[in-house]
Amino acid sequence: MNTVKDILAEKGKQVWTVTPKTTLLETLKTLRTHNVGALLVVESGMVRGIISERDFAYRIAEKMACPLDEPVETWMTKEVIAVSPTISINECMQLMSREHIRHLPVVDEGNLVGIISIGDIVRAVISGQQSTILGLENYILSQRLNN
């Protein structure tokens, strides 16, 4: 796997979303139901923000409360960083590290086509390393057998 497109082909393109008016309680339930760390906030087909477990943790610590009936738009991150399916896994790692983020929506020609997480990136890197190791082991074994 070399690109975001490869990751999406492996994991699928399912994106869980909420609307800006969805309550924080419903947002938390959606995160739990789908066992995901972030949801995109979408309105009229446009990404308006992203809300993550980290957003909840920071806001609760900041306010010392979680008003569960508030709309998610009051807590979401509004400046969403998105990537193209053609971006490399290495570029994603650098971007996530530099911006201190764990989730990246994937947009192709203005259309939302998926979302990737730091966990997806780690799995892709490990898979690539395992393939490299297996290839090297096979090469070494073949060299021993030929000598």
Residue ranges and their predicted role:
Residues 2-48:
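A positional/architectural concept
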Residues 18-35, 82-100, 107:
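The conserved cystathionine-beta-synthase
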Residues 31-34, 39-55, 96, 104-120:
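A glycine-centered beta-loop-beta connector
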